[in-house]
Structure formats: structure tokens, C-alpha cells
Amino acid sequence: MNRKLCAPADRAQSWESIDWKKAEAYVKKLQMRIVKAQKDGHYNKVKTLQWLLTHSFYAKALAVKRVTSNKGKNTAGVDHELWKTPKGKFEAIEKLKRRGYKPQPLRRVYIPKKNGKLRPLSIPTMTDRAMQTLYKFALEPLAETLADPNS
């Protein structure tokens, strides 16, 4: 049996070819479906939609984009790994898998305060930050739905 392995047609093949508007729309749509399922009391559907979101290529791509474009993008964790190149960012998307994932220890840095003392700062690895962002995408709609409307 001679089979050809191909990537799905709608999935990007490189960092530069990712359609960011489509990715944001996909994640936003899944988040809205999570909110609707929560309001309707369909908790199994909420869980299923959260699973879909955390395993989707677009959500992983947005998580990596967010981590690599924020203020701490040049601060490495204990693994001293930074995702600066488009190739490195695309490989990071592929690495964001729950199976076998184990968070790394935090890198501890002490930064000076105004009074001369030092304040501890814990820095996670890029992979840990991206994984946190990915799961934030799935949990944030619930937090907003269940939060106090006056807060």
C-alpha cells in the first residue's frame, strides 16, 4: 500500500504563511461557543470545545505569537531557549503537545527595588509560557462568563 502523507490543506506550512486573521477568528469562534455551551448548561460540550481549542493548530500558533511578541520575549528560562526566527516559532507550534509535557523549573532572577533590596523574579521557559497562554484561551471564556458582572 503506497500512501502519500500530506498536511491538511488549510494548515500553514511555515510561520510566514499563517493567516493570522483566520487564526484569530477561529479561536474567537470556539471561545464564543464555549460561553454559549456554559450558559446553556452543556458542560460536556464545554469540555469538548476546550479540548478542540487546546489541540487546534491556530490556537497553538496564536499562543506562540503572543509569547514571542510580548515584553518578555527576549528573556529565556532555565533552558536558555528563545524563539526568534520564523523557523523556531513554527517548530515551537509543533512542540506544543500535552502528551509528555512536563513544566521546567523556573529561572530565579533577583531585580533591585528602589529601596536597595532585591526582589525575586521567576521566569518560565518559552514552552511553558506558550502552554499557559494556550490553556488561557480555553479557560478565559469560562472565567468571564462566571465572574461577577460588577467586577
Task: Tell me the role of every PLM-derived stretch.
Residues 22, 30, 34-151:
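Conserved pre-catalytic core of RNA-dependent polymerases
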Residues 1-25:
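Intrinsically disordered, low-complexity and often Lys/Arg-enriched segments
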